[in-house]
Amino acid sequence: MLASVSAWAQETGSIALDYRAAEHRLLERSDALAASDANVQSKEAQAGATRSLGRPEVDFEAQLLDYQKTLYLPLGSLAPVAEAFGIRDPLRFRRRETAVRPIVTATLPLYTGGLIAGTKAGARAQLDQARAEQRGAADKARLQLVQAYYGQQLAEQALGVRRDVLAGLDRHLADALKLEREQFISKAQRLQAQVARDDAAREFERAVADLATANAVLAGLLRAPEGVRPITPLFVLPQRLESLENYKAAALSAHPELERLRALEAQAQAGVTIERSKQRPTVAGFGQYNFDRRDSLLTDPDWTVGISLRYKIASGMGRNQAVEAARQTVRQADAGLREAGVQIEIGVAKAWNDAEAARSRFLLLDSAIESARENLRLQRLSYREQQATSLDVIDAELGMGRVRVQRAQAAYDYVLALAQLLELSGQIEQMADYAARADRVMP
């Protein structure tokens, strides 16, 4: 139980990674990011497919026909003569044949009422949405990495503190047993030491379990079954962060969620264009050529060119209501975009304030640790001289551990708040740079 944290990590065979290397591994191996990449590629292909809209469409059609055709030919003034020869009026001809009809048809849209433009705009907006979602997924994965990576660091710090507290209370219990045998203290004081030591042992066991859980989380996130040993320590920047307004401005211009909502708004606008096109006529040029004229029907032309105009007079669906529905979708997207901007500004302000508060707590706890360490030393000396009770030593030992844990927690709170601030302002890819320039780290 008293083995050091570094020895424990080495025994597990875990791989040592600094934060930048861990981030690189995450971006390479995350299945969620692979899925978002595939979505972007899908939308890129879809947008590419719409670029050819408006070009001529050429169809080849081959028909195998088994047909029968009956023709009637009126004889007119020749009817009396024909009747003398037993010929009925009108003459009837019946033809039954099997024929092959190879036909090529070309169609060129000349005017679609905005359908093609709306379809292209919608495809581009879907691509923009996919790219925003891809970036958002990457940013959320980075934030999750910060929580897991530095969460394991916090668990290691807590384990080290619980180990030291347990060792200190072991020493105190040994002293109490000696003093009890020499009848310098009562059994009640020795029992106080025993109870405190047992509590510390349970806290240590819980810290071991917490560290194992944190390691499992980070190992799973980085697809490293052998485990990961973080080597970039918890840190706190001694100087204040940039102004809150700078982070807000960055968030409103670069946050992936706002980009996603802008893309949705563009899709809604494209939907309005498409619905309006259904109220307008369409004009197209066309041409058709028959490659086998010998077997063609009497009504089939050899070739045809022309212009067609098509306008739907009545529809089973209310076209005006469809346009209005599309407009309301635009309003919905616009309102959602404004609301998201407000919520992101609130989130940025909270994260900025949390980071500054954690930084202040961390710096103030420096002097608290020195005071707690000196108090513990004096209480131990006073106890040996019978100037302090067992409870005084226990309180001093626990107080020292509490302050150390609070300092590690303050560093973790700072790192997490900073990561949330950077994620909200679209800058979380700079997290490794912030860690590199920190000069206040947890050992």
Per-range role (PLM):
Residues 5-9:
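Sec/Tat signal peptide C-region and signal peptidase I cleavage site
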Residues 11, 17, 136-252, 351-354, ...:
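Periplasmic alpha-helical coiled-coil/stalk elements that build and connect Gram-negative outer-membrane
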Residues 11-12, 66-68, 406-443:
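Acidic, low-complexity, intrinsically disordered peripheral segments
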Residues 15-18, 57-136, 259-340, 351:
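Small/polar-residue-enriched beta-strand and adjacent coil segments characteristic
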Residues 16-53:
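N-terminal targeting signals for Sec/Tat export/insertion, comprising classic cleavable signal peptides
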Residues 20-27, 78-89, 185, 224-288, ...:
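Amphipathic alpha-helical coiled-coil scaffold segments and their short linker/junction regions
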Residues 35-50, 137, 141-163, 171, ...:
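Amphipathic alpha-helical coiled-coil segments
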